[in-house]
Amino acid sequence: MINNPKVDSVAEKPKAVTSKQSEQAASPEPTPAPPVSRNQYPITFNLTSTAPFHLHDRHRYLQEQDLYKCASRDSLSSLQQLAHTPNGSTRKKYIVEDQSPYSSENPVIVTSSYNHTVCTNYLRPRMQFTGYQISGYKRYQVTVNLKTVDLPKKDCTSLSPHLSGFLSIRGLTNQHPEISTYFEAYAVNHKELGFLSSSWKDEPVLNEFKATDQTDLEHWINFPSFRQLFLMSQKNGLNSTDDNGTTNAAKKLPPQQLPTTPSADAGNISRIFSQEKQFDNYLNERFIFMKWKEKFLVPDALLMEGVDGASYDGFYYIVHDQVTGNIQGFYYHQDAEKFQQLELVPSLKNKVESSDCSFEFA
């Protein structure tokens, strides 16, 4: 058993009442006072107005008006019901300029930035190319590893590099058996980035890729694919190519119409540029023309003096064959030997490895 003080206190109450009744019986009974009318001293409550209310009026008012019931659309119950309601036009957006699909009957498709760029069969991250750079009678082994590929789609513009990677060359100097550089590239899309440097925007990131228009013509004309591309435009658009990259239009041209030297046909190509056809989509063409620019040495990126006997101040004129995957280029710098040729082929083993892994960001 436990002691419960509540039971003792209840038991003592009747004794007190009994003693009080005995005292009242001994004393004379006083005359009771007349009852006071409720209307004389009403009980009032000040709610929302200054007018007094009776107690029963207040109770009835609370029942009728139901003050404590929240009927707002933003109440907890309404939001819980909204969460279980299927998508419909009656649902409102709670965020300004919200384009998420929950707020409308027809979901709005939000296009991400990565949908504006593409990779090709050979131009993709982790792809490797091997070959040589030829300077006079010397050949130097070259390896190119692509890291990022963001070729803009049709009607899309971007100042971000369309392609980046690492270029390694062996045997260029005796002091450094192998030199590696990080490079960035832009594709010629025939619109705001044309073959001529004068057509490129005046942006700091693009200035390193520019030369004079005459220099551009002298280098582009050395690519057979470039000559075929513009000469065929004058032959009713016969632009089909065979397996060797030769167009049917070029086959039908007399030999004297094919440019052979940069200096002889620079004026002719300049006139072709003035009447350059509007390419529908450069990605649909067999050949993709680019400019590659080496940015700094790796891993010694802080080596500002460079390497004795080597320079990366210039840039490459590049053409890529989307059918064979081959890359051909010419290095240009005003103080370097002209028309140093770059020849690269894709590594088939690396092509399989690069296609095994792909990522998409939502």
UniProtKB/Swiss-Prot annotation:
GO biological process: negative regulation of gluconeogenesis; proteasome-mediated ubiquitin-dependent protein catabolic process; protein catabolic process in the vacuole; protein targeting to vacuole; ubiquitin-dependent protein catabolic process via the N-end rule pathway
Cross-link (Glycyl lysine isopeptide (Lys-Gly) (interchain with G-Cter in ubiquitin)): K20
Matches recorded under Pfam families: Vac_ImportDeg
Maturation and modification: Ubiquitinated by the GID complex, leading to subsequent proteasomal degradation.
InterPro entries: Vacuolar_import/degrad_Vid24
Membrane topology: Peripheral membrane protein
Inducing factors: Rapidly induced by a shift to glucose-containing medium.
Stretches the record annotates as Disordered: 1-40, 240-267
Disulfides per UniProt: none
Site (described: Interaction with the N-terminal Pro (Pro/N-degron) of proteins that are targeted for degradation): Q133, E294, Y316
Ranges of Polar residues composition bias in the record: 240-249
Keyword Membrane: yes
Localization annotation: Cytoplasmic vesicle membrane
Keywords, ordered alphabetically: Cytoplasmic vesicle, Isopeptide bond, Membrane, Phosphoprotein, Protein transport, Transport, Ubl conjugation, Ubl conjugation pathway
GO-annotated cellular components: cytoplasmic vesicle; cytoplasmic vesicle membrane; cytosol; GID complex; vacuole
Family from the record: Belongs to the GID4/VID24 family.
Misc note: Present with 6650 molecules/cell in log phase SD medium.
Function: Substrate-recognition component of the GID E3 ligase complex recruiting N termini and catalyzing ubiquitination of proteins targeted for degradation. GID E3 is regulated through assembly with interchangeable N-degron-binding substrate receptors induced by distinct environmental perturbations. Required for the adaptation to the presence of glucose in the growth medium; mediates the degradation of enzymes involved in gluconeogenesis when cells are shifted to glucose-containing medium.
Subunit structure: Substrate-recognition component of the GID/CTLH ubiquitin ligase complex. In the absence of stress, the complex exists as an inactive anticipatory complex (GID(Ant)), composed of VID30/GID1, the E3 ubiquitin-ligase RMD5/GID2, VID28/GID5, GID8, and the RING-like subunit FYV10/GID9, awaiting a substrate receptor to form the active E3 ligase complex. When cells are shifted to glucose-containing medium, the substrate receptor VID24/GID4 is induced and becomes part of the complex, named GID(SR4).
Protein's UniProt name: GID complex substrate-recognition subunit 4
Organism whose genome encodes this protein: Saccharomyces cerevisiae (strain ATCC 204508 / S288c) (Baker's yeast)
